[in-house]
């Protein structure tokens, strides 16, 4: 009778029940699952089968001993007591992995050293020779796990993790491990669908991991058939004849599977850079006759199997990690739902996602959800039957003349809150649109938290929409805030009739110091817009602000009207949009000062766009320092400082409330006789110092500097006209 060993199989969190079923099918007896593992009993043949055929395990460990550990010395003695001559040649190589802690062993490196020392000392005492350490490809890899004073000492039969099948030498930005992909396919019912001759399509296939794993299952190919080196290859307990028998059996099954008519398995990928790596992976896996990959956008996804058979749509859409990804992800899921409803009636779909709340935006009900972990990220597999009765849209599916189901043409139905938000946008558009068309305003604020539960600012930039989400108070449930954001983002394209890809979203929080200048993205896309006869460059993606403060539109137009023949000074000039207006208005010269080189470069482009350059001076400096040294005279000065600012180039921090008196005194000293200084800022609690009002002729003109799009929010800024008494 063959020896029976205790076997311990590790796996990613969430795969335990699937691995338990798989391991039992491969012969593991007395099996039971625990967190990220399955343990049971089996012969060496069972252990070999698990190594060769498990699609889900990370490692197959053969348990050598279990023992209590009181301290490092007792652990050393227990490991030393094992007869290591049965497992490792004294002149061979060894690697030790240690996990867990306790019993005075709180450092895994120290624990591994003690285990290694015990093995080396054992072999040296018996043979006079000692093994050397090879952490990459050892003859034997030993693992010791310590948990609550109990140690489990094992041999790693698998060697490198079993998810490394050997075919995926090229991968994309966010790949799924092969065993996780296999688990998702099993949960999605692919083995049954494949057995019935069904098809499989992945509309966002990346480098093809789902496709290869699906083909390996369908063709009855052992996932690790092509692996050449195993953890047991140089283990002294290895039985080569038994292994050869099992390996030849697996080769025969693979040959028989590949000899069958291939199933229809197709992948589509928008990124052309991933197409060849994916095809290379498929070729290495030996399933090139079964799997085909094409370049294609999600918008054109329409699987058409050769025999018209239905099957499984499987995909792992991207999930966002930076601010602003919400909109693109929302619309991606909406598009995925639309393609399923339009082109995949009668199919099953499995959407594996790290953002399951976005699954609700597909417009199709998920009848089953499975929890997984992709590393440390909690994920879900959303299972969907693509049938009209499952659609959550503005209409139910209809029937064609031949009785076949026809997908609804409408987008996913808005939630009740989303519809209310859409109605408000359309109401505002009717009111503000008339004003914007009459005054030829291309860029304006359409919505500014009009409904408190939808705390957004929605700005129109020509045929683009720029959305800023105001950060919710800590008292607001983040999940509810995100759900409302998704409601709003779903409503915007429908309400405004804009393409989804022309909606850009950011999160607005209080910006201080360097953060106000930090990039949010690096797309570098500039959009040209018009205002009052000038052309200006805005960037909707890369920075928190777009390069154009919409609330200052009336101030810029005022400057344009008053600038003729005057020397114009623009302090804290940002992208110098006011300077462009002054130059257009006929200013004799302009000087613009800002601490940000990025925005001064932007300012230079704005001026060049309008044909101005020679007389326009751009100064890279701290405004306060520059004012202390400048001796020029200016008939028109505009100051719109940030609330706070700091930089390595500054001494200290600029605070508009604290530093206003010095700032205005320095600037007024530069004001030419008969000149005017306009001062504005956006600090809602700002109060103009009484000493300023006592020394100069001060007139608050805030009301005159607000157009209809900001009339609902009179605290957006305050503005004053200041002259010498």
Swiss-Prot record:
UniProt keyword terms in alphabetical order: Cytoplasm, Methyltransferase, RNA-binding, rRNA processing, S-adenosyl-L-methionine, Transferase
SUPFAM superfamilies listed in its UniProt record: S-adenosyl-L-methionine-dependent methyltransferases
Biased composition, class Basic and acidic residues, residue ranges: 395-404
Ranges where the THUMP domain occurs: 46-157
InterPro entries found in the cross-reference section: 23SrRNA_methyltr_KL (IPR017244), DNA_methylase_N6_adenine_CS (IPR002052), RlmKL-like_Mtase (IPR000241), RlmL_1st (IPR054170), SAM-dep_methyl-trfase (IPR019614), SAM-dependent_MTases_sf (IPR029063), THUMP_dom (IPR004114)
Gene Ontology CC annotation, any one: cytoplasm
Location within or outside the cell: Cytoplasm
Role description: Specifically methylates the guanine in position 2445 (m2G2445) and the guanine in position 2069 (m7G2069) of 23S rRNA.
Annotated family: Belongs to the methyltransferase superfamily. RlmKL family.
Protein's name according to its UniProt entry: Ribosomal RNA large subunit methyltransferase K/L
Species for this entry: Pseudomonas paraeruginosa (strain DSM 24068 / PA7) (Pseudomonas aeruginosa (strain PA7))
Gene: rlmL
